[in-house]
Amino acid sequence: MIQQFTLLFLYLSFATAKAITGIFNSIDSLTWSNAGNYAFKGPGYPTWNAVLGWSLDGTSANPGDTFILNMPCVFKFTASQKSVDLTADGVKYATCQFYSGEEFTTFSSLKCTVNNNLRSSIKALGTVTLPIAFNVGGTGSSVDLEDSKCFTAGTNTVTFNDGSKKLSIAVNFEKSTVDQSGYLTTSRFMPSLNKIATLYVAPQCENGYTSGTMGFSTSYGDVAIDCSNVHIGISKGVNDWNHPVTSESFSYTKSCSSFGISITYQNVPAGYRPFIDAYISPSDNNQYQLSYKNDYTCVDDYWQHAPFTLKWTGYKNSDAGSNGIVIVATTRTVTDSTTAVTTLPFNPSVDKTKTIEILQPIPTTTITTSYVGVTTSYSTKTAPIGETATVIVDVPYHTTTTVTSEWTGTITTTTTRTNPTDSIDTVVVQVPLPNPTTTTTQFWSESFTSTTTITNSLKGTDSVIVREPHNPTVTTTEFWSESYATTETITNGPEGTDSVIVREPHNPTVTTTEFWSESYATTETVTNKPEGTDSVIIKEPHNPTVTTTEFWSESYATTETITTGPLGTDSIVIHDPLEESSSTTAIESSDSNISSSAQESSSSVEQSSSIVGLSSSSDIPLSSDMPSSSSTGLTSSESSTVSSYDSDSSSSSELSTFSSSESYSSSISDTTNFWDSSSSDLESTSITWSSSIDAQSSQSVQSVSNSISTSQETTSSSGEESNTSVTDILVSSDASSILNSDISSYYPSSTISLSDDFPHTIAGEPDSRSSSSIASTVEISSDLVSLTSDPTSSFDSSSSLNSDSSSSPFSDESDISASSSFSTLVAPSFSLSSSSSLSLTYPHYVNSTTYHASESESSSVASPSMASESANDDTHTLSESTDTTSSIGTDSSTVTFCRRDNGDGCIVTGMPSSSIDSEQTSDVTTTSSFVASSTPTSAEQSITDNPNIDSSQTSASSSTKSSVSVSDTVVNSISLSETSTLSSDDSTSSDTSISSTTNSDTGNINAGSSHTSTASIKESSIQKTGVMLSSSYLSTKLSSTSDITTELITTELITTELTTIEDNEPNTFTSTPSSHSEIFSSDNSVLSKQVDRESTIKTSPTTDVTTVSSLSVHSTEASTATLGENSFSNVASTPSNIATSLRSTSSSSNHATESSGTVKSEASAEAIPSPPTSTDNRLSYSTEEAKGITYANSGSTNNLITESQVAAPTDSTSVLIENPVVTSTFDDNSSAAVDQPSKTKSIEESIMNPDSTNETNNGFIATLSQAQVPNSLIHSESISTTMAKTTDASINGDSAASNSQPTTLIQQVATSSYNQPLITTYAGSSSATKHPSWLLKFISVALFFFL
């Protein structure tokens, strides 16, 4: 019986044991004790003592429960015992076993089991000390290679795990003091195997190894080598404790025995080091000796032979221990109705047990009975202290009734609904609903109907398929309004009838007209079936006949019958010989009307006429972005007239007019008709062709208009009038630069003399007239316009010439048919030229005026290109080249206006002459390069962006205008001349380089940018001269000359910035004393002044590693102004206060970056009335507004506000009155570092024009201000001022350097000539402050992602 009880107890104990977590709650300390005379505190050297806090609560932990502490990167426990007890007050509450990871796992663990001393009334807590050694590598095994990356020299975080609870502490590990370039050795004892792992790494060869031999062996035979546990490889570097971090295979030969192991290797690449490790078993682990073979040859070096011997000794183990306190809970019965808890007095320094007393009421026992009902009743039988009270509980129970219903679920459910007011409960049973049914009707090939039912599983859908035979079909044919046939099939449901409707177009109709014998007309229509032809027969009575008698030139008579169609009139023409010799001929055309009459005269008249008409029309298909039609018309006429042989009169005119309106479409159809009519006979020729052009546009237009007319009339006894009209057309088409197609036709005029027979009218009579007036007029007018546009197009053309010839004694008509086609490609170009000349009629005007204007424009754009090199190194290159050339030339010659004055000849009244030359050249080249490389396996990314932008522009403008007027004794003399010249030359070059490297393993982020911008702007020779000479009645002479030359030679900005480590400590800058020199020379009351000033801002040496950045600015500006006036005055001073905000703007490519500093200024000015002839000199300039963000300066207080924003500039104009008094101050309250005081140097200077410069560099602000005081009144014929300014700013910071020294230099030279001396003072200030490195880092990273 006792044995059975014992077995049952053991079974219940093991059955209820469980795994618990959260027992270890902290790492209280982690300290190192030198157990083997080690040279440094390395993580792998014993012993590291970890003190951990623990707590066991008997209410949640039971005997037999287990818990585990995992210790990553721990190599072994260095204790002599195999386990440690968790003890409190001398009582063991749990036992923990040591499991060292060694070469087996990357972690060690502590597995604990709760023993029987822990009861539910006990809560024990305490600490345990664990002696350990960490694993930071030491062999080529996978476990050691992984743990070789656990820690680095310096501060590390050690983390242990108890279930989901992590215990961490910070600890400092020292780096190995052994030189990594020499040979490296390590030995570690593995208690579980009772063996030692020995490592040997060959000395370092930076360029690699040509060959070598390495190994180790026992010196006295007391060490056995395990050849089954050997690792050989090459490692790419070692960690901070000289252990391999990688292992790769290479070429070697191995020799191994129980006495020694060695390898011979060849050709090890640079950056790798060979190593060998093996397990050894010394006879005494605390003391043994090994001999090492060390022969090697580095690349490009000599053979090295350096064997050595090492004696190894062991270390002293540390013991694990535990201590803690016990909390005991006791229970006492009281008469209270509730339970109370109290703690007895406890002194932690003396007592080892903490007692908690639980006060409980009298215990009770409960008896439960049941009955059919609704409510529960309670009754209590009391008892004194020491006995047990009884509580009787009468619990009701209910009977049930079952209800079954259907639901949408897939299973059957049973739910009991308790009735709170009755003793009968309801049991609801829900069964799934039956599946829904879907009926589908289909056609099939059988002639009968079939039904099939398909039943699916629960929650599915059952299907009923009804199969019906196909419906019969009825076909109907109909006529419809379309020109094509179509068939429509109407399918009905089963048991219906399908319909096929065939729609046919209406039959064509043929109409036939016939004569018949009746006197009335009738129409008969014959209609056929579809696809036939309907007939309409019209029957007409015969036509009436009209007989006409005419004269003709033959000597015999003839009869001609002309029969026409129905409803017409037939004609009978009788031709009789001519009896009179007079005629009239009328010829009409759409272009001209020529009539002539003549009779015998002593004059011989030659008359020729040729009429050529050309008309063209085009119909173009519509498109979404082009006009829908095109029309072109060309008319040309030429006429010449000769009055008689003895008169000096001739007239010749030629007029050509072109109008064009076309659409840009893919098809153009042209139809052109030519006709020719000559008075010698009746001949008509019709030529028709069509062309199709698939193009964007292609046109060539030439318009020529010339007119030469001379006329002179003299008295003659007999008069005659002859008009000759000649029409000539020349059509020239230039389709493209590749295809030139010229089509020309020339129709010579026929010559008619008096000996020819002319047609005359019966009533025609000769006409004669005479004239006695004489007039002479010469008019010459010429206008030439040429326009050529050849965009890219494809040209297709086809032509046809139709001929149908029929002949009769009086007419000949012919049509000729031909066709051709061709296509070509048209290249783009554009040119425009215009010229005109004018000569006015004698005797009112002489000489001539010619005007010439030409304009050309060419443009070329290079297509972008893109290239890719590899998957991990992509190179994208974008290139764009745009060349634009535009030139305008104008030539104008002199025109002389004359008027006749009493017959004395021509008097010159005006000789205006003007010349305008303008030339503009623009050359823009844009090159952008983007290089991206990435290596996803190592989580390193590198991005480089090297855009390059070069832009240059040259423009020149010259204008000259003069007017001269010369008159006789009455007209006054006025002379005006004006000359202005403007030229400018702009050049801008920009180069930006951005690089970024990110390494996710080490957490390093490097971002940098380099920007170079060079600008050259030159604006010179702005000169304007005006002179006015009045007549003799006025004596005032006014002249003014101004010559302003401004030249900005070059501006170069180079910025390079690399961001590495944040530095929030401010630096203090000192200012070197300023120096200036003045040179005064006096020559004929002319005083010259030269001022040179240099201000240098230096920084004190810094030793912290901050940001690598540099900024250099070079700017040279020169301006010269010369002003001549009759009188000049300045303004004296009066008190006033103003506030000035200085802004400096730098632009690159298509964006502008602005920075601004706020300067407080005080000024005073007083107005003095100027003489009536004085002129106020005003300076107009543009400002740009900027808004931005204010960045706080960590570590210093500075009221300087820096603003930056990429925004388009807004132009505004302000007017500055000459000679205000300006005093500028700059406040800087930056706090200085210890022993580095700040210095500020102030300089004040007053010159003719106020000037202020604000240079904002990368993290530095340098401000120089100038002030001006009023000048005395100056009366001078001229004032010349020349100002040259050069700014060089360079700011460099280098993480490897120990200091940085920015320098700012401003030089200014002013020269003035005046009658009275100037009042000159000097004032200025300069200061600088350094922004913390975090701001530079933020800006650089933001700039990188922005670009």
UniProtKB/Swiss-Prot annotation:
Name assigned to this protein: Agglutinin-like protein 5
Species for this entry: Candida albicans (strain SC5314 / ATCC MYA-2876)
Subunit structure: Forms homodimers through the tandem repeats. Aggregates in amyloid-like structures, with self-propagating secondary-structure changes, amyloid-characteristic dye binding, and induced birefringence.
Membrane topology classification: Lipid-anchor; GPI-anchor
Effect of residue 406 to K: In allele ALS5-2
Principal location listed in the UniProt entry: membrane
Region of interest called Disordered, as start-end residue ranges on this chain: 580-678, 704-725, 789-813, 855-896, 909-964, 977-1021, 1062-1111, 1139-1180
SUPFAM superfamilies: Bacterial adhesins
Molecular function in Gene Ontology: fibronectin binding; peptide binding
